[in-house]
């Protein structure tokens, strides 16, 4: 599956090329921001099997993502974080992403998905063929350990403790 705005910076043309090469249907969810771009991708990749599902409420989207073999992220720019990667992994879905920006930092290559060189559709296609090697439970465990509310709260507490300790060291000096 693919989740994101339908716009050039999300790299949907690479997803279409991936679909054409692998023969797999890729479900696409997101706001249709650039309809001309969507049509151009379809024309340029006539063998792609993209199934546009529209923009869904979060709970429905998570249920849909959970039925995917993988989530594909092909950003053409440096994404700051990549909430979609967290949402997919929380449902046990591995993520295939380019080595660019936040998603590449979230995905543990070979454990919760695959991180491939940016703009390398051949590497994405290879990753698709290996997707069954990923243990979906590990995807969920990674999100629980690193991105759950409890994990984030623990990091904030640690940070505050470090700031207080540093402040005390300055006062004592």
Model-derived features: positions:
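A charged, aromatic-enriched C-terminal amphipathic alpha-helix characteristic of glycosyltransferases
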Residues: 133-169
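Short alpha-helical segment that forms part of, or immediately flanks, the ligand-binding pocket
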Residues: 62, 85-90, 104-105, 111
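Short hydrophobic beta-strand element within catalytic cores of glycosyltransferases
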Residues: 94-97
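Nucleotide-activated donor-binding/catalytic signature segment of Leloir-type glycosyltransferases, i.e.
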Residues: 28-30, 38-59, 63
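Conserved donor-binding/catalytic core segment of Leloir-type glycosyltransferases
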Residues: 1-29
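Conserved acidic donor-binding segment of nucleotide-sugar-dependent glycosyltransferases
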Residues: 108-110, 114-120, 128-133
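Nucleotide-sugar-dependent
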Residues: 75-82, 104-105
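A short alpha->beta transition loop at the rim of the catalytic pocket in nucleotide-sugar-dependent
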Residues: 69, 92
